[in-house]
């Protein structure tokens, strides 16, 4: 008679009784009872009686040993959690043996089982014996083999000894050799030391010699400098002597002429003629002598350039002097400024009157680092001469000195001009012929005619000095005024001419036409232009090297024997050239830095570019009467009209005449003070043209025509063009025509006038450059367009082979390139050096010009250039960078791209060597490029390339193919996977021609590994809650083994597989656009794709699947949005395919539970799916049923599943369930053994009667603060960012990273605050945050999305949860009462305060937007305007004081990290900062749990009692929430909230019910203090009692209330039942402790450390 629950398995303890059982069975088989005699029958009866007695003894022995040994061996390894042991113990400890019914079968069956076990053991022994025999045979064979091996071993040992002897001899020999070699090494080392010592000595000698050599070099350079200085002085003296000689010769010639005239006059006198001419001759001679006496002796003087007077004029011998030429833009190859004639300094006429010596009325700032430079010896004076005194013969103004800015003219100055006078008049030369005045008047317009800028300048009053001119006063006055006004119009720079930023400065005499590019520079700042020649050395005639101004200034062509080219850069003012020792390209101050006139400022007017004809032809009167000329004492010189005298003008200046009169100090040898002509006292002047007795001939007009064209003076140019007989195609010695000068300087109107006048459009200069070449080089695209329209030769090649297209490319002029290409120019022309336009444009590094040259197509012939171009002809430069082939194919052929110059360099060589990576990339896009082409030095493009360009070339033909991970088709909608992406880009692979399949396989594997590590690491997540990160599993379990297949386009490929073609050829031919990696999914019985799609670690999903397969009844529960539905469906799908692979048919049945889902519907579902089977019917084999019940939180679990709990646990016919059918009949059913039941509950914890269901299911809790939910959002958003950045991980400083981190912190802080408020029903899972937008550079979109999420989801849930808690009537059934339909004023205020606190502490805190932008979005959030100080100032007052408690205080959100404004929240008392939560588990309250919580229970029990007693006595419902909100407001840092995360869900307390008489009766004084000594033994007693008393009575609830714990009465009365049930329930389904009772969260202590229950 076995006890209940005994197992039927045999045991070794029954072995001794086996023979008795065998002998008992034998008589039944061998004897026939009917044939036996009496004696035999008696014998048999005695034997059988003995057997019965023996059998009884066996049974008793078995029973005794069962209790002692069998149970211990069978169940000794189980702990108290085994339900079977609990049942056995209860059964045995219950009633006596007589009352028990046998649970197991007859003891005979036990004996039979023992005998059967013995037979099995005998068979097993036989097999083992046979095996032992075979092993013995093998052992003998091995012994024989061992003996043979020993013999071989002996032989080998003998050989080894022989070898050792031989080796010893060899070792001895080696040792001897080593000793010899070591001796040699020592000797060599000694020699080496000696040689090194000698080497050091030689180095010292060498260094000494080098020092001596450097000293000698310094001496030689000093000597060379002295020799150069002396040579320059000798040159200067020679030039001065030549000038003096030429003047003496000229003077001699004049004297001869006068002698001739005297002779003629004597003859006339003899004839009785008039003698008046003899009176003027001595005067002229005297004047000439006076002028000649001062030539070449004085240094440069500072003169005024603001008055307009005639020049002092001298005659010179033109035949002996060649013109001095100054090129404004010198070429490094043509430095020629030679002074072949006079080389003297400008001097002042010693006979000049005081009133005619003009001082500096407007000082100019000196150039930067200007130093005094004495030319031809030191100057005695340090300041400019006072204008009121005549300069002594040796007096000179220092070139570098100038009056300070803003200083007025010195007292005593007789300057006739001021800031208020637009122009100052000067007296005409006395005795000037009226015909000359008429000639001067001929070229002038009306004095009051508007100029080019539309301005009219009135004529100032004239100043007459000489009384000899009074007889011609009217005519001279009119002529002088007109000339002055016209010159004021022609000599000012044009306004508004935009400077072109720098291009390569090439000179007139070089291989390219001059390219002058300047801008208005900062005043006083010296700038060195790249490519300019070095500055002119001192003591040489010349000017500093500066580019031309934006408006062409006065240019005077001169020659010098020893000086390099020079020019002065003048920005809208009159200045002399800076010293030649200044850095090259130094800029002179511009007009903005000058003192402004108080009179209305007129725009600047164009200046004249004056060039002297090479033949010495005179220039008309327009060029002579200029600002800054010194008044002459000489009454008039009657020279020939067409004088051949040379014009020596050492500097170039421009004036802002009639606007801001400016005086400049002469800063360079040879610098002059006159504005336009700048002729000094020694210089032969232009005024003889005007002083002659006859009209000015047309021989000087071509030079003036060139100047007008170069300066853009349309008025003068049009007047000159209207004259008859003028050669408009006249060229100077450099071959520059007027059209060339106008085109070079970009004067479109002048070009149009000249072209209309039929100027030669293709006239070339001496270097072969046409006007189109000059305009293209300078970038004047309007001139280029005009010249092309007049049929200019677009493919004209200069002497060196440069075409206009080449020059435009060389200087990077994109508009000119475009115009020339549209005109059909030839792209294939080459220069003499073998350079093509492609070479030229690549050499500049201009990407846009290169794209135009390569891709811009010429329009069809016949299209007008003025018509708007069709859009198809315009190449999109920006889009072209990505895929120019998609927009347009290259126009230029491969031969041109690969054309090599004289050195063998292609355009790719140039781009690579200069590091122009963008240009090289564009060249590489041309399919015909040959990167392996070698130059004359046998170097490829890669050999000469920089590092960046080498990397580009190495990836030249590389295919950039994206790698994407696909998880297959994600089932739509209702499973919570709307935000999951089917494919994600992880990287881009560069596949080169040399890439092998092994390399490709490794690259794919490495890319996958890096991607999985990147999305699972927390590299750039700066989270405040570090405790949560410590528990996060950084590895999601994916690797290359998770890959199911890899698709190369549409071709499947596996890692390690090789095709006949290389990867590059394969990708090219199959047009593979992407590599898709397919992960193993549920269809293959794996969960890798589910892991990647949901970011839930793989090992957790596998654990969930194991629980389902093991327990078959599993429910997933967690806060809403925890992806329960998705997880369950994916697990069901995986389980289905696994079972189908094992040969089972499987079916998934899904039911969505709602409030109207009844038990009958559930029964029908079970029956229809064959999950419930009638008792009489056998189950269907090889069939699996998976039933999914969604949204179980919407129904009552106890009502829905209460009757099925036991049948679900024991699935057999022995535990059926009775089902009522609709017709009133009932039937018995049982559950199919292969039926899996899964459910989902969107609820953080269970309450009430739902706890009765809990122990019958396996529960999987998805906590928001634990894996997998805790890290899911972080991993998901990180993967989203990586996908958005095409596989790259952005830096932590990126705005996207900050925004994503903010969204993650919002979710965590929000749940922290909600758990702290005790509203677990409002907790949110990560699902709602998966749709966070990731838009690089647009954080506003994320904030807008957050506001919509707050308004649509978060705020309504929080409002509902707060109202339900605030309006709760403290009834036992938590969750069953709802909020009031009409909440009170206090409840509404609590809700508003809670929303405001949550918004500011959880949502807006940490937002990456600036404060100003955040304020714009704050209004979008619902409930953010509540004054938070009301929460802090609220007291638990009675209803009648409630309105007074809620004071309106103006507060704003608390400033956090300088982002929010400071709060006015009141700080709560630290002792009451938070009401401390306690957790008392009533169902499983053992002593250890009590001790772990005892310390926190003792510390603050009195505070909790005060609140609970107050609530129990009927105080305000919202007091507890207000207290909680107060503590949240008073927390000084957000970490206070995040610290709650570790213990918030584990610390629970039961509501103290207002209708609990047992508890209320024990509390007589709500304010009664409770000491810790009283609390400690009570709490300990209570927990011990609950653990040890298995038969507690209902009255024990009253004694429990005496322990002052807030336990509701309803729970206390059920203590005995729950305790008994818990002791007998199956603990294999491990129960969540904190879900065993209805509970409510309260404020937690910051420092409480509570042990979490084991899952």
Swiss-Prot record:
Residues annotated as coiled-coil are 120-275
Tell me which GO cellular component terms the UniProt record holds: actin cytoskeleton; cell cortex; dendritic spine; FAR/SIN/STRIPAK complex
Q: Mind telling me what this protein is named?
A: Cortactin-binding protein 2
What is known about its subunit structure?
A: Interacts with CTTN/cortactin SH3 domain. Interacts with STRN, STRN4/zinedin and MOB4/phocein; this interactions mediate the association with the STRIPAK core complex and may regulate dendritic spine distribution of the STRIPAK complex in hippocampal neurons. Activation of glutamate receptors weakens the interaction with STRN and STRN4.
Chain's role: Regulates the dendritic spine distribution of CTTN/cortactin in hippocampal neurons, and thus controls dendritic spinogenesis and dendritic spine maintenance. Associates with the striatin-interacting phosphatase and kinase (STRIPAK) core complex to regulate dendritic spine distribution of the STRIPAK complex in hippocampal neurons.
Which positions does the record annotate as the modified residue Phosphoserine?
1515
InterPro entries documented for this protein: Ankyrin_rpt, Ankyrin_rpt-contain_sf, Cortactin-Actin_Reg, Cortactin-binding_p2_N
Q: Which SUPFAM superfamilies match?
A: Ankyrin repeat (SSF48403)
Repeat (ANK) positions are 700-730, 734-763, 767-796, 800-829, 833-862, 903-933
Query: What gene is it encoded by?
Result: CTTNBP2
The UniProt keywords, alphabetically, are: ANK repeat, Cell projection, Coiled coil, Cytoplasm, Methylation, Phosphoprotein, Repeat, Synapse
Residue ranges annotated as compositionally biased, kind Basic and acidic residues, are 1637-1655
Compositionally biased spans, kind Low complexity: 377-416, 492-505, 1616-1630
| Pfam families assigned | AAA_lid_NAV1, Ank, Ank_2, CortBP2
Extract the Gene3D superfamilies matched here.
Ankyrin repeat-containing domain
Judging by the UniProt lineage, the source's domain of life is Eukaryota
Compartments reported by the entry: Cytoplasm, Cell cortex; Cell projection, Dendritic spine
The lineage is: Eukaryota, Metazoa, Chordata, Craniata, Vertebrata
């Amino acid at each position: 008679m076995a006890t209940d629950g005994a197992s039927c398995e045999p045991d070794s303890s029954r072995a001794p009784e086996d023979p008795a059982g065998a002998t008992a069975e034998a008589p039944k088989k061998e004897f026939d009872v009917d044939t036996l005699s009496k004696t035999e029958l008696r014998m048999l009866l005695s034997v059988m009686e003995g057997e019965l007695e023996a059998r009884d003894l066996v049974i008793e022995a078995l029973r005794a040993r069962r209790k002692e040994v069998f149970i211990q061996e069978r169940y000794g390894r189980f702990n108290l959690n085994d339900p079977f042991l609990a049942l056995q113990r209860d059964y045995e400890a219950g009633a006596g043996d007589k009352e028990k019914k046998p649970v197991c079968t007859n003891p005979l069956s036990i004996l039979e089982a023992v005998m059967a076990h013995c037979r099995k053991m005998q068979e097993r022994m036989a097999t083992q014996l046979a095996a032992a025999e075979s092993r013995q045979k093998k052992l003998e064979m091995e012994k024989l083999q061992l003996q043979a091996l020993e013999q071989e071993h002996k032989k080998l040992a003998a050989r080894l000894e022989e070898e050792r002897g031989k080796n010893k001899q060899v070792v001895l020999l080696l040792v001897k050799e080593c000793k010899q070699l070591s001796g040699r090494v020592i000797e060599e080392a000694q020699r080496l030391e000696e040689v090194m010592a000698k080497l050091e000595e030689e180095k010292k000698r060498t260094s000494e010699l080098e020092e001596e050599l450097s000293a000698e070099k310094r001496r030689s350079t000093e000597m060379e400098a002295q020799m150069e200085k002396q040579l320059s002085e000798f040159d200067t003296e020679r030039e001065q002597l030549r000038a003096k000689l030429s003047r003496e010769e000229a003077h001699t010639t004049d004297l001869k002429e006068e002698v001739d005239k005297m002779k003629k006059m004597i003859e006339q006198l003899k004839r009785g003629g008039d003698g008046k001419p003899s009176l003027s001759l001595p005067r002229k001679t005297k004047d000439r002598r006076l002028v000649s006496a001062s030539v070449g002796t004085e240094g440069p003087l500072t003169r005024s350039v603001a008055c307009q007077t005639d020049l002092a004029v001298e005659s010179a011998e033109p035949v002996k002097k060649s013109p001095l030429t100054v090129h404004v833009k010198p070429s490094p190859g043509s430095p020629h400024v030679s002074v072949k004639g006079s080389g003297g300094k400008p001097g002042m006429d010693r006979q000049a009157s005081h009133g005619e010596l003009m001082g500096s009325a407007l000082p100019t700032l000196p150039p930067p680092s200007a130093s005094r430079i004495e030319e031809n010896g030191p100057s005695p004076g340090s300041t400019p001469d006072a204008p009121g005194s005549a300069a002594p013969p040796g007096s000179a103004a220092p070139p570098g000195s100038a009056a300070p800015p803003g200083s007025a003219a010195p007292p005593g100055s007789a300057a006739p001009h001021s800031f208020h006078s637009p122009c100052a008049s000067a007296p005409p030369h006395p005795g000037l012929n009226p015909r000359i005045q008429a000639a001067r008047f001929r070229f002038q317009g009306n004095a009051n005619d508007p100029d080019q800028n539309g301005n009219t300048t009135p004529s100032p009053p004239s100043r007459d000095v000489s009384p000899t001119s009074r007889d011609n006063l009217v005519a001279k006055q009119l002529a002088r005024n007109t000339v002055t006004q016209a010159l004021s119009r022609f000599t000012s720079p044009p306004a508004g001419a935009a400077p072109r930023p720098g291009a390569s400065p090439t000179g007139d005499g070089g291989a390219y036409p001059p390219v002058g590019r300047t801008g208005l520079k900062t005043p006083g700042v010296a700038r060195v232009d790249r490519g300019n020649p070095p500055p002119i050395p001192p003591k040489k005639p010349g000017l500093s090297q500066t580019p031309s101004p934006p408006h062409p200034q006065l240019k005077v062509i001169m020659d010098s024997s020893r000086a390099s080219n020079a020019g002065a850069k003048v920005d809208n003012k009159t200045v002399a050239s800076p010293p030649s020792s200044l850095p090259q390209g130094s800029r002179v101050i511009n007009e903005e830095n000058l003192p402004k006139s108080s009179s209305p400022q007129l725009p600047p007017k164009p200046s004249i570019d004056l060039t002297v004809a090479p033949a010495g032809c005179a220039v008309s009167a327009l060029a002579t009467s200029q600002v800054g000329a010194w008044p002459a004492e000489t009454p008039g010189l009657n020279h020939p009209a067409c004088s051949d005298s040379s014009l020596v003008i050492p500097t170039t200046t421009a004036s802002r005449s009639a606007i801001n009169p400016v005086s400049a100090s002469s800063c360079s040898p040879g610098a002059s003070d006159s504005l336009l002509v700048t002729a000094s006292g020694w210089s032969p002047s232009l005024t003889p043209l005007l002083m002659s007795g006859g009209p000015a001939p047309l021989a000087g007009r071509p030079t003036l025509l060139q100047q007008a064209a170069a300066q853009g003076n349309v008025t003068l140019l049009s007047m000159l063009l209207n004259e008859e007989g003028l050669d408009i195609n006249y060229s100077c010695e450099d071959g520059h025509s007027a059209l060339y000068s106008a085109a070079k300087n970009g004067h479109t109107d002048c070009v149009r006038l000249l072209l209309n006048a039929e100027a030669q459009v293709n006239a070339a200069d001496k270097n072969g450059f046409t006007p189109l070449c000059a305009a293209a080089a300078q970038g004047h695209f309007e001139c280029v367009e005009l010249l092309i329209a007049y049929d200019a030769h677009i493919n004209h090649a200069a002497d060196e082979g440069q075409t206009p297209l080449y020059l435009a490319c060389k200087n990077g002029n994109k508009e000119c390139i475009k115009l020339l290409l549209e005109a059909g120019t030839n792209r294939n022309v080459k220069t003499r050096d073998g350079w093509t336009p492609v070479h030229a444009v690549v050499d500049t590094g201009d990407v846009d010009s290169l794209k135009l040259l390569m891709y811009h197509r010429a329009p069809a012939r016949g299209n007008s250039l003025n018509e708007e171009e069709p859009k198809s002809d315009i190449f999109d430069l920006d889009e072209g960078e990505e895929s120019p082939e998609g927009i347009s194919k290259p126009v230029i052929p491969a031969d041109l791209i690969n054309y090599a110059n004289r050195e063998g360099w292609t355009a790719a060589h140039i781009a690579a060597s200069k590091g122009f990576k963008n240009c090289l990339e564009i060249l590489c896009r041309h399919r015909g490029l040959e990167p392996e082409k070698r130059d004359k030095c046998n170097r490829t493009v890669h050999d000469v390339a920089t590092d960046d360009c080498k990397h580009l070339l190495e990836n030249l033909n590389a295919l950039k193919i994206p790698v994407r991970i696909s998880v297959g088709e994600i089932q739509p909608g209702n499973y919570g996977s709307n935000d999951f992406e089917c494919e994600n880009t992880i990287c881009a692979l560069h596949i080169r021609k040399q890439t092998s399949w092994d390399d490709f396989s490794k690259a794919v594997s490495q890319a996958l590994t890096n991607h999985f590590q990147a999305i699972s690491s927390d590299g750039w997540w700066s989270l405040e809650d570090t405790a949560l990160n410590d528990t996060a599993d950084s590895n999601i379990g994916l690797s290359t083994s998770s890959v199911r297949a890899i698709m190369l386009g549409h071709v499947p490929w596996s890692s390690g597989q090789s095709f006949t073609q290389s990867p590059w050829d394969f990708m090219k031919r199959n047009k593979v656009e992407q590599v898709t990696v397919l992960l193993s999914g549920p269809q293959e019985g794996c969960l890798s794709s589910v892991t990647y799609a949901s970011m839930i670690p793989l090992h957790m999903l596998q654990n969930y699947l194991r629980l389902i397969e093991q327990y078959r009844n599993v429910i997933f529960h967690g806060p809403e949005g925890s992806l329960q539905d998705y997880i369950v469906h994916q697990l069901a799908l995986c389980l289905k395919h696994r079972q189908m692979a094992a040969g089972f048919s499987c079916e998934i049945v899904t039911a969505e539970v709602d409030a109207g889902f009844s038990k009958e519907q559930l029964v029908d579902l079970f029956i229809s799916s064959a999950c419930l089977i009638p008792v009489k019917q056998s189950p269907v084999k090889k069939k699996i049923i998976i039933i999914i019940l969604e949204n179980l939180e919407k129904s009552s679990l106890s009502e829905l599943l209460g009757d099925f709990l036991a049948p679900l646990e024991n699935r057999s016919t022995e535990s059926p369930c009775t089902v009522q059918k609709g017709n009133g009949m009932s039937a018995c059913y049982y559950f199919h053994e292969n039926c899996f039941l899964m459910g989902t509950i969107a609820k953080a914890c269970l309450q009430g009667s739902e706890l009765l269901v809990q122990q019958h299911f396996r529960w999987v809790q998805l906590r928001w603060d634990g894996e997998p939910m805790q890290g899911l959002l972080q991993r998901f958003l990180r993967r989203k960012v990586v996908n958005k950045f095409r596989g790259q991980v952005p830096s932590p400083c990126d705005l996207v990273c900050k925004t994503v981190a903010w969204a993650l912190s919002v979710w965590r802080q929000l749940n922290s605050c909600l758990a702290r408020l005790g509203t677990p029903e409002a907790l949110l899972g990560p699902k709602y945050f998966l749709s966070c937008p990731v838009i690089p550079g647009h954080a506003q979109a994320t904030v807008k999305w957050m506001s919509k999420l707050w308004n649509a989801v978060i705020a309504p849930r929080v409002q509902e949860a707060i109202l339900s808690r605030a309006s709760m009537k403290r009834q036992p059934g938590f969750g069953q009462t709802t909020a009031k339909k009409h909440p009170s004023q206090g409840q509404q205020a609590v809700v508003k305060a809670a929303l405001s606190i949550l918004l500011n502490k959880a949502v807006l805190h940490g937002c990456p937007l600036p404060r100003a932008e955040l304020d714009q979005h704050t209004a979008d959030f619902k409930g953010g305007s509540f004054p938070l100080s009301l929460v802090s100032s609220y007291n638990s007052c009675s209803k009648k004081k409630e309105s007074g408690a809620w004071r309106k205080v103006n507060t704003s959100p608390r400033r956090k990290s300088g982002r929010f404004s400071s709060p006015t929240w009141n700080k709560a008392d630290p002792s009451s900062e938070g009401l401390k939560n306690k957790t008392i588990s009533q169902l499983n309250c053992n002593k250890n749990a009590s001790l772990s919580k005892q310390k926190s229970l003792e510390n603050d029990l009195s505070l909790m009692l005060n609140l609970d007693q107050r609530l129990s006595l009927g105080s305000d419902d919202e007091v507890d929430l207000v207290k909680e909100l107060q503590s949240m407001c008073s927390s000084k840092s957000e970490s206070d909230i995040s610290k709650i995360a570790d213990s918030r869900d584990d610390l629970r307390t039961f509501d103290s019910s207002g209708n609990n008489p047992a508890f209320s009766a024990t509390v007589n004084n709500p304010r009664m203090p409770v000491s810790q000594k009283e609390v400690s033994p009570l709490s300990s007693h209570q927990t011990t009692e609950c653990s040890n008393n298995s038969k507690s009575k209902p009255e024990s609830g009253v004694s429990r209330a005496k322990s002052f714990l807030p336990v509701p009465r309803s729970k206390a009365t059920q203590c005995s039942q729950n305790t008994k049930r818990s002791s007998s329930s199956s603990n294999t389904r491990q129960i969540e402790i904190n879900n065993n009772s209805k509970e409510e969260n309260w404020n937690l202590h910051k420092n409480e450390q509570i042990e979490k229950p084991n899952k």
